[in-house]
Design a protein with these regions (language model features):
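Non-catalytic interaction/Regulatory regions outside core domains
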Residues: 1-25, 29-117
């Protein structure tokens, strides 16, 4: 499965997600879809991640593997694994635990051929 197929599967199973982007190790967009918000997701996710990481470091907290910012209109979720990040925008009241599971699965599926056996 490639990254575009993994995103397509994610969007088919997770009805909460409105837009998603997969980011590479340098924060570059590898793939995204759908919607006009996708093009700006990488930069926004990078700024959000850096701010949250700095806050965690200042508090001597553990390194982050995900962040979720939620309000009445929806949520932004960023998850990091194996040097890559995935960011999603959702509609109102997403099931956050399921959302994070789906994002982790998408990221894993997108790069399954690169992972050591």
């Amino acid at each position: 499965m490639n990254v575009d197929e993994a995103i397509r599967d994610l969007l088919n199973i997770s009805t909460d997600i409105r837009s998603v982007a997969v980011l590479g190790p340098e924060g570059e967009t590898i793939a995204c879809g759908p919607g006009t918000a996708s093009s700006g997701l990488a930069a926004a996710a990078d700024r959000l991640w850096e701010a949250a990481s700095a806050s965690a470091a200042a508090a001597d907290a553990a390194a982050l593997d995900h962040i979720v910012v939620q309000d009445v209109a929806g949520a932004v979720a960023v998850l990091q694994a194996d040097g890559r990040r995935i960011v999603a925008l959702t509609g109102a009241q997403p099931a956050v635990g399921l959302l994070l599971f789906d994002l982790r699965t998408c990221l894993s599926d997108a790069f399954v051929e690169e992972d050591p056996a």
